[in-house]
Amino acid sequence: MSEMTPRKIVKELNKYIIGQNNAKRAVAIALRNRWRRMQLNSELRNEITPKNILMIGPTGVGKTEIARRLAKLANAPFIKVEATKFTEVGYVGKEVDSIIRDLTDLAIKMIRLQIIKKNKKHAKKRAEERILKILIPVPKDNWNEENLKEKPEKTIQIFRKKLQEGKLDNKEIEIQIAATPIGIEIMSPPGMEELTNQLQSLFQNLSGKKKNLRKLKIKDAMKIIIEEEAAKLINLEELKEKAIYSVEQNSIVFIDEIDKICKHHSSASNSDVSREGVQRDLLPLIEGCTVSTKHGSVKTDHILFIASGAFQTSTPSDLIPELQGRLPIRVELNALTVDDFERILTEPNASITTQYKALIKTEGVDIIFTKKGIRKIAEASWKINESMENIGARRLYTVLEKLMEDISFNSNEKFGQKIYIDEKYVNLHLDKLIENEDLSRFIL
């Protein structure tokens, strides 16, 4: 992270997101400030809180993608939630505290995978010993590593070498493997997810750690045993401590559709009261409080919150003043143009056109998008967005799916062919779609 300067962060984001430079700069600075803060002494570090961000822009312009890619760059716990899913305390529905509980669960899984990866080499060695125990039997009552060493060294080395070289992969062995706990589905009322989790954990513990005798090929058994041995090397208390620390110091919470919980001036209904209640419940979470989770208490003082909304029927000033103050950095994202659509189709890593080409290539068909064909797809997508609901870059998926429908359906009949997606091909397949979209405006 020390090498990830704001300029480099923006460069990485440019690989996946087209345009929106102001938003990229804002999140890059926010992420770099996380690293800068961690270099300070503990007294000053605790005084510095993250500058939360409010992204304003229409749907499909890259708000969520920017936050998601940022979390991957930081290798930090990240959760995306929709503000409309939550209700004020006392109402039926999810409470905002569940955001932090879910985030902590994600951090536990993330740190667990990191520890397993770190211990994989040691776990593999232990897995080999378990398999060698079966291949070179010794009395069960007396089993230990010393017994294995007492066996002729030459025999052990021969089997170990064959095992490591994969020559025994298809040999079947019988092995004791921990049974998968029976999943018990409990339907809980909204807002009581924590109680459900506790009940599920209780039932799983009551079932005990049973083991099943299974007959498997050595290559399949090795994978399962490595996972088992790696799990045994995990210190649960240390895992929880690391996960909670990661949540408190590095995590990012992305709250989407925050404009939907704004109070509308034109109405004064109970729903507006509830919306304002959700905003007030979010206040302590964003400002900094302690949330109890099943893994321990989590302080939210240094979690970075990124909120976003289209604000088509409201403005950021419709949020309660206290919440506006907790989101000091405001970034406006621009609506996408035809040129943006053209770049989205070709420039990002694993662009949409690259994905379609790779999928159809599996059938032995080469798809070639010409420059004029790409331009026509971009123009068609932009035109439909302007005439209908503007869904931003997501419109490209609709258009391309329609465009590629015939090729996808008949690909087995076109084996070995090269198909050019040019202006003529696009006109032939998309003109009807555009006409239908235009007509639908006049139908009630």
From Swiss-Prot:
InterPro entries (UniProt xref): AAA+_ATPase, ATP-dep_Clp_protease_ClpX, ATPase_AAA_core, Clp_ATPase_C, HslU, P-loop_NTPase
Pfam families: AAA, AAA_2
Keywords of this entry: ATP-binding, Chaperone, Cytoplasm, Nucleotide-binding
GO biological process, one term: protein unfolding
Major location (coarse): cytoplasm
Keyword DNA repair among UniProt keywords: no
UniProt binding sites for ATP: I18, G60, V61, G62, K63, T64, E65, D256, E322, R394
Subcellular location: Cytoplasm
Alphabetized GO MF terms: ATP binding; ATP hydrolysis activity; peptidase activity; proteasome-activating activity
Gene Ontology cellular component annotations, sorted alphabetically: HslUV protease complex
Protein task: ATPase subunit of a proteasome-like degradation complex; this subunit has chaperone activity. The binding of ATP and its subsequent hydrolysis by HslU are essential for unfolding of protein substrates subsequently hydrolyzed by HslV. HslU recognizes the N-terminal part of its protein substrates and unfolds these before they are guided to HslV for hydrolysis.
HAMAP family in the cross-refs: HslU
Protein name (database record): ATP-dependent protease ATPase subunit HslU
The organism of origin for this protein: Buchnera aphidicola subsp. Cinara cedri (strain Cc)
